[in-house]
């Protein structure tokens, strides 16, 4: 094992098809990296689901391999941060166990629910959330579960998002950042708060929704069990993290109004800074 001569961080991204982890030093050099794919279940046409356990396993495996490849003193890795795919809700019961597979943003089963919500709320959704509702957003997906899987829905105690679920496994906290909730169409990005009248449609306890914090906030330290498994000290700080797209836009340097990032992945995206 050698010293890299600079502070390092461990970053992981939970993608649609795979999780990628890297060890990055303060000069921007990648010291180690790893990638692990997972399956998407498609039980019916237009449906797409993944199990959150697969994300956590992929994080642990790729983090361990990236740290090993980096060949640095684990004490030199000063923080862990996770980004991830959006619009996907992880449903937990009162024991923090996953209730069902997560419906992906590529799933369109909730067209009926999306149409009904647009009929009920109209332009109010766009005005409050700055987004046009469709089946790929979390609100209609959750309403589909509420209407079609009532036994499942009655067990829901907490709602998290992919990167928040994995982070919760390594440092328990029911938190999210201020960007991930925007993908639900249940969140006001101007006030950085959940929209009570929209959330009330799903009839969940107000405590079910994760508390938003800034993406760069330190939210805890890695648990002893996870630290031992991936090869880090148990006191390593864990940062809140954010969505994959937000991290990509920032990473490409698109910071001023008019600058644009084009993303080519499972789903292409064009992101332009407006203010």
Residue ranges and their predicted role:
Residues 1-101, 127, 155, 227-228, ...:
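N-terminal glycine/serine-rich phosphate-binding loop of ATP-dependent small-molecule kinases
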Residues 14-16, 125-245:
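Gly/Ser/Thr-rich active-site cleft segment
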Residues 34-40, 114, 170, 202, ...:
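Short, small-residue-rich loop/turn micro-motifs
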Residues 47, 55-56, 105, 137, ...:
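Signature tryptophan residues that serve as conserved aromatic anchors
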Residues 56-60, 64, 111, 115, ...:
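Generic alpha-helical structural signal
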Residues 89-114, 155-156, 160-195, 236-275:
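Glycine-rich phosphate-binding loop of actin/hexokinase-like ATP-binding domains
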Residues 119-123:
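Conserved FAD-binding subdomain of flavin-dependent enzymes
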């Amino acid at each position: 094992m050698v010293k890299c001569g600079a502070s390092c961080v461990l970053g992981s991204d939970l993608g649609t098809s795979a999780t990628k982890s890297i060890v990055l030093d303060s000069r921007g050099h990648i010291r180690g990296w790893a990638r692990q794919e997972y399956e998407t279940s498609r039980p019916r046409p237009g449906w797409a689901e993944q199990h959150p356990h697969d994300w956590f396993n992929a994080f642990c495996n790729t983090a361990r391999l990236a740290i090993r490849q980096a060949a640095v003193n684990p004490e030199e890795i000063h923080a862990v941060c996770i980004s991830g795919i959006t619009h996907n809700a992880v449903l937990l019961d009162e024991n923090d166990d996953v209730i069902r597979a997560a419906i992906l943003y590529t799933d369109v089963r909730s067209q009926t629910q999306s149409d009904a919500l647009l009929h009920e709320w109209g332009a109010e959704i766009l005005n409050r959330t700055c987004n046009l509702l469709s089946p790929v957003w979390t609100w209609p997906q959750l309403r589909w579960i509420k209407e079609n899987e009532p036994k499942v829905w009655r067990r829901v105690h907490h709602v998290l998002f992919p990167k928040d679920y994995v982070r919760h496994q390594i440092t328990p906290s029911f938190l999210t950042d201020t960007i991930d909730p925007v993908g639900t169409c249940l969140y006001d990005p101007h006030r950085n708060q959940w929209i009570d009248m929209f959330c009330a449609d799903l009839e969940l306890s107000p405590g079910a929704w994760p508390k938003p914090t800034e993406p760069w906030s330190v939210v805890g330290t890695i648990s002893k069990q996870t630290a031992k498994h991936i090869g880090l000290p148990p006191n390593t700080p864990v940062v809140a993290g954010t969505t994959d797209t937000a991290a990509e836009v920032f990473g490409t340097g698109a910071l001023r109004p008019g600058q644009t990032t084009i993303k080519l992945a499972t789903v292409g995206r064009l992101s332009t800074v407006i203010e």
